[in-house]
């Protein structure tokens, strides 16, 4: 038995949403509970829009950002909110890997259409990185980069 199989035996892969043992990312039950943002999203930050006649959410229409555009995959509520909390504060790097792959699959067509040539993770302040033990955005970005064959800076 190789090391990977031993690790899976000792620490079986889990669904990042419900934390039940599941070998392939997000389980089917949890997929049904997710609010995937597919349309009617802010053209600046990627949040879902309540007023579908607008291009920008109220926050982005009031302030300037240093980036051109951002996309979000999931709405930050319910089980996703708890899952992301565990990813950030309970050192669940495996969740970050899964979310990175999920983003690559679901946002890959948009990324290719926009002709994005590299992925740049949001830097994390040194104090926060020391406290959390890692930069979750960097792990997500590396996972996306592997799936999409894009460099990560």
Predicted segments with their positions:
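Glycine-rich phosphate/pyrophosphate-handling loop used in enzymes and phosphotransfer proteins
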Residues: 1-153
């Amino acid at each position: 038995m190789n090391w990977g199989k031993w690790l899976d035996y000792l620490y079986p892969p889990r669904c990042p949403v419900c934390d039940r043992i599941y070998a392939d990312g997000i389980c089917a039950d949890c997929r049904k509970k997710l609010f995937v943002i597919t349309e009617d999203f802010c053209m600046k930050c990627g949040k879902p829009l309540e007023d579908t006649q607008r291009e920008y959410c109220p926050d982005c229409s009031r302030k300037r950002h240093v980036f051109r555009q951002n996309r979000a995959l999931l709405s930050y509520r319910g089980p996703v909110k708890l899952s992301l909390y565990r990813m950030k504060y309970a050192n669940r790097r495996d969740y970050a890997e899964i979310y990175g792959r999920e983003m690559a699959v679901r946002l890959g067509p948009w990324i290719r259409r926009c002709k994005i040539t590299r992925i740049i993770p949001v830097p994390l302040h040194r104090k926060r990185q020391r406290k959390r033990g890692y930069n979750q955005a960097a792990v997500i970005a590396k996972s996306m980069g592997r799936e999409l064959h894009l460099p990560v800076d």
